[in-house]
Structure formats: C-alpha cells, structure tokens
Amino acid sequence: MDKFRVYGQSRLSGSVNISGAKNAALPILFAVILATEPVKLTNVPELKDIETTLNILRQLGVIANRDETGAVLLDASNINHFTAPYELVKTMRASIWALAPLVARFHQGQVSLPGGCSIGARPVDLHISGLEKLGADIVLEEGYVKAQVSDRLVGTRIVIEKVSVGATLSIMMAATLAKGTTVIENAAREPEIVDTADFLNKMGAKISGAGSDHITIEGVERLTGCEHSVVPDRIETGTFLIAAAISGGRVVCQNTKADTLDAVIDKLREAGAQVDVTENSITLDMLGNRPKAVNIRTAPHPGFPTDMQAQFTLLNMVAEGTSIITETIFENRFMHIPELIRMGGKAEIEGNTAVCHGVEQLSGTEVIATDLRASISLVLAGCIATGETIVDRIYHIDRGYEHIEDKLRGLGAKIERFSGSDEA
C-alpha cells in the first residue's frame, strides 16, 4: 500500500493548474448513459474514481476511451447490460448515479449498494424515493438496488426532504427522459449540479433553474451527443489556496473560477490572506504571515463547503487564536483531528463541533488518512511540520486529487510516494 513521505518546513509558493472537478465529472459520466450518440468530454481528471466509473460504464456496454489529448470519448448507443456490479461499485458511493439514467432510458437497472469514504451516513434513500415518485418500482435484494418501470418515467413535483447533491442529480438525470414536467423543490445548488445540467441541455434536455433550489425539467424523448468541458475543481483550488495560507506562501491557481468559492475566499481574507481574482485565476499571498483563526460552519452551497472543512481545521491548528468549527453536513468528519493532535495540534471535539487552539509549530510523525479531504490535510500538515511525516492509506487522495505530489513539488514541497514494503 502506497504512502507519502513528506519533509517539512516548506513555504509553498508558485503556480498550479487546477484540474477538472471530480464532483462534476462523475455525474456527467453517468449521465452519458442517457445519450444515443457519441459524447466527447474534456478537462476530465485522471483519478481512481474516474477510472472506476469508466469501468462501470464499460461493464454496461459503453465504449469509453481517452484519446491522445486526454479527452474522454464515450458511446452509449449499444448498452446491453443493466447491472453495476459489487466488485466495481464497492469502492465508490457515486456509483448509485448509474441507476437513474438506466431506468430513464432502458426502464430497468440495478446497482450494488455502494462504498466510498467512511464519513458517516450518506443514505441512498433520497435517490430511491425520488425515482419511486417518478414511477419506478424499486426493491432491495441481495445487496442490490433494483429498479424498473413498465414504460417511461412520469414527471411530477418532488420535494427533497434534506438538501442532497446526490439525490438532486439522480432525479434531474431521470427526469430528462420522463413524460411531462418534473419540478425539484429544495434542490441542492452546487456548481457541479449546474455543470451537469449544462451538459444534459447540450444533449437536448430541457432543464431550467439549476443553481437555485427550484429546478424544472421538461422531459424529452431522447438525448443526443455533444462535446463538453468539465468545470474546474473548486475544492482542489481551495486546497492549494490553503497550502499557501498555512505556509506563509504565495500561490496562483490557474484555470479556475472564483465565483464558485466565495465562502472560502471570504474566510481566507478573514484569516489575513491577500486574495486577488481574475476571470480564470485566483492568487493568494500570505506575505510570510501566520494566519488568524477563523470560525467555520459548513452548509450546503452557497455556504461553506464541507469538503474544505478538514483543510481549514489544519489552518486553525496553526493559526493565531482559538476557533470553533461546526460540521453540519456529514457525521464522523473530524477523523483527521486526532491525527493532527498527534502532530502537536490542540483541539477538543464535542459532537459536531471542534474547538481548535492554534500552535506555532506542528511536528512530523506517522499518520493515517481516513477519507479524501482528511488525507490532504495531513499531507499539507506534513509540508509545514518540523521533521518527517509519513502519511499512510493515501489511496484516499488518489480518488480525488490528480497528480497531487507533482503539483505540490511544483510549489516547493518535499514529498515522495513509496510502497509500504519499501520502508525497511
């Protein structure tokens, strides 16, 4: 199993090119199931979860390949299987997104109950209830969610009980081929939902209101092919801005959009960072200063993103002052804090709240990554700690960050990947 060895006390500065957003690329790839003609996608990151998704699509009968430019070429015109099997689905919760387009286009589909990051309850109930309201019959048998409908799904008004990005995307995909009009109330508003809707509309869907809490979908009979470029990854952008903020450095994030990161940029400025934005870049300069502690409360977009909570927890661990971090989206999302405490951080956890007391210096040690965003916070901690830090279970990072060690080295980090068997 691979690990990272990180040598600390680096000031991270330079320019980094931001990859396409995993959280947009995944639903867009599954939405290709709806298309009767070839699709070309660009700015798709090279990640474990992307490769898993491509393998699921291939299992269904989709032709899926990358060309010499890195574009992903897909042809779903001859899908001949309707099951996403356990051996592929078990590593990735996003696999549930295969179900809605299969049922919408082929009137049947089954997906193994999914796996992924262990950060508390992420139930598929909202996906299932949304499809049922559109007319699908769904049963859970032998670890599989099995759905079918005798004819086309039928549009209706659906109120999502708790704001859910995943359920919003599932219902939106399914409704594109339903009879009549579907209205999603209390829809999630994330930029990745807007990008998925833009992609579906390019294929001939009729979706309006994406980015608001009220999405309307007028069903059509078929979706065609298109070309689409995936939006930049706002969480990767925020992660590299944090890298500069905690190390006193200056980082320019290229190929990104500031308007998807307002809540994060506001908090970075509150922490003392100088942040300048252009149409396609964000520059953060700490001018060599230590950050100031900032209180964080995660919330659905446009609030503060839960996927940036671990990175800001690290910032608060090394900031001047005391801060309160409240996690409202997922359970068990403070699993990085005990590891940061082992590095010399000071914090107490009570329920969904953590209180961080900033220290001047962290110390390198061996730590274990527990999920995707926790993993990257430990790597960044190693970059600024004294001595050497070993980060174990970095397969979590490979699920969501493209070429992470190369990008960090480009900013001056001293980091190397090695196999656990190479330690001796």
Swiss-Prot record:
Pathway: Cell wall biogenesis; peptidoglycan biosynthesis. One of its GO terms (molecular function) is UDP-N-acetylglucosamine 1-carboxyvinyltransferase activity. Gene3D superfamilies: Enolpyruvate transferase domain. Its EC number is 2.5.1.7. UDP-N-acetyl-alpha-D-glucosamine binds at R93, R122, P123, V124, D125, L126, K162, V163, S164, V165, D307, I329. It comes from the Bacteria. The active site is at C117. Keywords: Cell cycle, Cell division, Cell shape, Cell wall biogenesis/degradation, Cytoplasm, Peptidoglycan synthesis, Pyruvate, Transferase. GO terms for biological process: cell division; cell wall organization; peptidoglycan biosynthetic process; regulation of cell shape; UDP-N-acetylgalactosamine biosynthetic process. GO terms for cellular component: cytoplasm. It catalyses: phosphoenolpyruvate + UDP-N-acetyl-alpha-D-glucosamine = UDP-N-acetyl-3-O-(1-carboxyvinyl)-alpha-D-glucosamine + phosphate. The modification 2-(S-cysteinyl)pyruvic acid O-phosphothioketal is found at C117. Its main location: cytoplasm. Pfam families: EPSP_synthase. CDD domains: UdpNAET (cd01555). It is found in: Cytoplasm. Phosphoenolpyruvate binds at K22, N23. Cell wall formation. Adds enolpyruvyl to UDP-N-acetylglucosamine. Belongs to the EPSP synthase family. MurA subfamily. NCBIfam families: murA (TIGR01072), PRK09369.1 (NF006873). This is UDP-N-acetylglucosamine 1-carboxyvinyltransferase.
